[in-house]
C-alpha cells in the first residue's frame, strides 16, 4: 500500500518553477530519500504534503486521502521533523514529550510508555538535563522522538543530518533505519551518501 502518492504536482514562486510535474509514491514501511541541491524544491514538497504550501496543480494523497492546502486532516497520519527543530528549552525531554502528547490528545499512560520507548530508541533515555544544554545532534534526536510520538504512518524529515558532523549524521541515519519498523520515512538531503 502507498502511504504517500504525489501526482503531477507543479509549484511556482513567481516566474520560477520549483516543482515541474512531480510524481512519486512511497510504499508502507519503506525509507524514501529525497535528494537535491539547495533550492531544488525538497522543503516545498514537504510543506505541500503537510498542506502548508498551495500547489499550482496536481494532487497529493496521504493514506489515500487527498491533501488540501490549509487543512490538516491528513496530518493525523504524519510526524514531521523540520530542518531546525525548535523546543521549549526550559523543559526536560520527558516534560517536552508529555507536553506534545497532551496536545495530540494521547492518553496519559500511553504518553509515559511511548516517551520512554522513544527516548531509548533515540539514545536519550537517561537524559535528565534541560533541553537548553543540548547539542544540535541531541536536538535532532529529540525531534525524531517527538515526530514519532503519536505513531505516524509517515515520518517526514527535512534535512535531518544537516549541520551534523559525520558521527552525528551516522547516528541520525541509524535511528531512522530503526524507526522504519514503526513507520514509513521520507527524508530530504543534499548529501548523496545519506541516501545510499
PLM features: residue spans?
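Catalytic Walker B motif of ABC-type/P-loop ATPase nucleotide-binding domains
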Residues: 155-158
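Helical segment within the ABC ATPase nucleotide-binding domain
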Residues: 169-182
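Conserved ABC ATPase "signature" region
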Residues: 98, 102, 109-126
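Hydrophobic anchor residue at the start of the ABC signature
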Residues: 144
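Conserved ABC transporter NBD signature motif
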Residues: 58-69, 73-74
